[in-house]
């Protein structure tokens, strides 16, 4: 059989040296489909080569011929450039073979055999190098092909480490522990060989203001933030008719609740320009009031208002809320169904204080300290209940403009939601252009709105936040809804908290007055002079004046331990309010100037706080 395959020779012993080295012999061996026969023929030829004393030359020639055949099948071998599917530029690859089958190199074994070592089983290449404008961190955009081209941006340190590069598989590459080293080397070679042709760009991890420009309304800057936030970044876009949006929304703005939601949305990019702080606008009330749809209308200023895009449910942690706010930076944060995120203790105080600080806490990884994230945006929330409680701290109360929806925000919710899902994003760019062109006037206008609110009983923080909403509303009205009257002080006054409503000491004292009123038996004996149950103190009443102007002053001696306990159960701290109580006369000091009185109440000696009611 061997003789038949190798020509007319009967045995391998009759093969001459020229015939042994001929292309026909090599071809007939390699074309044999049966591996057993192919190996047998090759071994017979090697034995004949030994007899002719040319074994080494035969072996070299045979493997050279085999490699030459492989080269024909491997498009790109020896050319030093990529032959990837269309859609990406051709790059230099050096000794790497880069084609539709992936990226690999050919390694020759000591026995002369050659094997393919794959860095990637799919086409992959660096398509851009980036430097983050805020941090200076170098990043690389990788493009990879799996039925179609995909791209993702990674820190350069990630693609430079055998262990870290495996993380790129989360985004679709085929990096694994087996090929990691080769893939790192291939990408490093590509970056070195193509340093003068790969585009170098500036990147940023957030939206909003940057060096006087507003992302994403700026060309030439790429978003390099976490991939989880890419849908939000991409949602800042346009769809549908600008004119139809203005006409439709003009009618909706006759509702004061929607007007305030849109005013807060317009105010968000103004905050850093006018020196204002982040604030919360919270609309609450029963279901089917149209609060969520109103939120969508307010976010349609900037882009796609659908849930999961510019609007999101609050099924997220406080930390996630802060990192999302840092990514938005100056674009408003819109969160629906706030009650989902309620703290275990039953309040939202931590959320409010965290988002209104505008700075995320520092965090440290094992190898580096994370960048301190900041934001300066408005937070638009909706829910079924108030965001603050009677026991909420003054800081939380102060930072929230909280509005109970006693009527509907949107009358036809389904129709309106459908409309803004198909018409959105046009107003944002024009609004930012106006801000840039009129930057010098903004602080003056802001000051004017603050002055219009000075006659209203409210705290400074409430006044400053509402003035920002009024400024945003006024600019929005003039740009998109000409002829519309801007919000006035009378329009917004019902939604501002008075100083007393914000003052935690005043709220705590009112609470204790109610406790005393419904627990009179804890302070007073019955008609027989007996006390039953726990004794909390005593009440001394002083009556003065004449008819009809008789007045009664009640002095309540309240057991210190019980007072602290009752306040704490309601969410107040005695130590936080005692100084204010003493200052305004609600609490009387003893003759030594101390807050506590050592006295007897119904025969029981103890330490008491004297409250004037």
PLM features: what roles do these ranges have?
Residues 337, 376-386, 404-407:
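A short beta-strand-to-loop transition that corresponds to the Sensor-1 phosphate-sensing loop
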Residues 33-37, 42, 67-82, 198-252, ...:
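DNA transaction DNA-binding modules
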Residues 373-375, 391-485, 489:
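Phosphate-sensing "switch" segment of ASCE/P-loop ATPases
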Residues 220-307:
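P-loop NTPase catalytic core of nucleic-acid-dependent motor ATPases
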Residues 11-13, 33-256, 323-324, 328, ...:
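Conserved glycine-centered beta->alpha loop in an early N-terminal alpha/beta scaffold
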